[in-house]
């Protein structure tokens, strides 16, 4: 199953996340198909960028969002 979820980037105690499309069987930071955005929870305004067009495309072909990405995308 194809998932839209976050992969951790950054350094120790300074997380930064990419929002990516990947196979659900891959590890959290394993290979991914496409990066469609990023999320920075450390910045003052919790910066979130998301390519809505690509998100809608992947949802239309059957990709499922992780609960965290679903929550973040709903706020945007």
UniProtKB/Swiss-Prot annotation:
GO terms for cellular component: cytoplasm; small ribosomal subunit. Keywords: Ribonucleoprotein, Ribosomal protein. It holds the Pfam family Ribosomal_S16. GO terms for biological process: translation. Belongs to the bacterial ribosomal protein bS16 family. NCBIfam families: S16 (TIGR00002). This is Small ribosomal subunit protein bS16. It comes from Sulfurovum sp. (strain NBC37-1).
